[in-house]
Every structure is written in C-alpha cells, then in structure tokens.
Amino acid sequence: MLRYQIFPLSVSHIKNMFFKKHPKKFFSPEEQERIVEEIRKAEDRTSGEIRVHLDCCAREIPVEKAKRVFHKLGMTETKARNGVLIYLATEDRKFAILGDEGIHRVVPENYWEDVKEKMQKQFREDRVCEGICLGIREIGEKLKTYFPVEKDDRNELPDTISEEK
C-alpha cells in the first residue's frame, strides 16, 4: 500500500536544509541516533524490516520515487517480503510509507492510513523526528501482528537511515 502526504516544515528546518544541503543533515546526530534506535526496537518485535530514507526532493510523484528507492535498498529481497520504507523528501515536504508485497497480501487496503495521519500530526507541530519515530513504532506494532519474530529471525537489512547521494 502506498501513501504519501505533504507536511509543513518550520523555519528552523528550512534554514537547516538551506545551509546543510545533504539530506542526512536534516536531522541532528542525536535525532539520527534516536531514529535508528526506534528501528532496532521495532524490529525486535517482528520479523519485518523497517528503513527510513531521506531525499532532498522527489523530483516526481513521491510514491514513484519511494518505489525505486525501495528496490535500490534491496527491500524486495527479504525472506517474507515484509519490509516497510518511510520515504521523506525534505525540500518537497512529502513522505510515503511503502510496504512490500508480503505485507499487502494479508492486510486491508488502508492499512497505513492511521500511521500516516499520526506522523502528519507530528510534522504539523514541527516534530519531524518524533513523527518518524512514532511512525516506526506504529509500523513495528502493526507488523508484529502478521509477522511475529521467528525463531531463526535475523536482521536482513541495515538499521540505518539511508539518503540520496
């Protein structure tokens, strides 16, 4: 299921983007660490894999860019096809939540809608890091219902924030 939405950015985030061009600079080192820790915690409860990808601008429909990033990051290579990507285009102020086909074989069509709305609420309040962390927690909770941790579970994808080079 593909979802994307426009989110507002504060003056401080816009200044950071202007002076720090690289997407990874969008979050402070502390915020980056917090996001990675949320990914690890969420993945401790599910066999699913969660990635966060930052891009300055989608240069196209965000969902289409997210699909390409999803493939580029190898997210279609997980054993159960249960990866989820949070794609964030910082300059365009848009994001997408993209789940792999293994997830969408077993979940309802509007599965990510509540996650999107909760994240967007945080973004509107200039809490972008909290919005991402909340999204990761919510995704982890949802995934554990259909994809609990397996006995032989291993981390199939890096627990890092990727960014457009």
Which residue ranges define each predicted feature?
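A structural boundary signal for the start of the first folded domain, especially the loop/turn
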Residues: 1-83, 88-165
